């Protein structure tokens, strides 16, 4: 698959995300790997529902620097961290869905555990609803370097698959392709909504 096709698919996914209302008020950021050294990352302050390929900046994975001098998204360091930690990751999606944002505040533990839902099989490697999906929840931090360091430390100690939540902030997920990252996003968002509804009903 060519870089141009991957980027075109990412633009289409960004428009889909925008139509869903999952990146309101220009929030969120999305990227696709170019090669081992560079990725293409959405520019800061752009409406994700109206992006074109010109709205993506080439970013060096090792330094999180954009050679063009244009301003990449605030969470650039999280995208480059994922590409560094997971050589098989080729696309990263960071969104601000209401379910992810609220659920990340309800969960007081460092990890969210989800089980019993058939839709868990939308996540690569999950084959049954009987398994438990673990989604790490990290405290939000405006210091992206410090946040990236905590996530990297977690990944050294524990398995980190599919994505993670930032408390009061949103969801970051990834995949081996744009298509897989999109499936992980849609699957996790559905699971988060189910978890939210289940918790609400259990309180009645």
UniProtKB/Swiss-Prot annotation:
GO terms for cellular component: cytoplasm. Pathway: Amino-acid biosynthesis; L-methionine biosynthesis via salvage pathway; L-methionine from S-methyl-5-thio-alpha-D-ribose 1-phosphate: step 2/6. Its cofactor is Zn(2+). Keywords: Amino-acid biosynthesis, Lyase, Metal-binding, Methionine biosynthesis, Zinc. It comes from the Bacteria. GO terms for biological process: L-methionine salvage from methylthioadenosine; monosaccharide metabolic process. SMART domains: Aldolase_II. Pfam families: Aldolase_II. InterPro entries: Aldolase_II/adducin_N (IPR001303), Aldolase_II/adducin_N_sf (IPR036409), MethylthioRu-1-P_deHdtase_MtnB (IPR017714). HAMAP family: Salvage_MtnB (MF_01677). Catalyzes the dehydration of methylthioribulose-1-phosphate (MTRu-1-P) into 2,3-diketo-5-methylthiopentyl-1-phosphate (DK-MTP-1-P). This is Methylthioribulose-1-phosphate dehydratase. It comes from Citrobacter koseri (strain ATCC BAA-895 / CDC 4225-83 / SGSC4696).
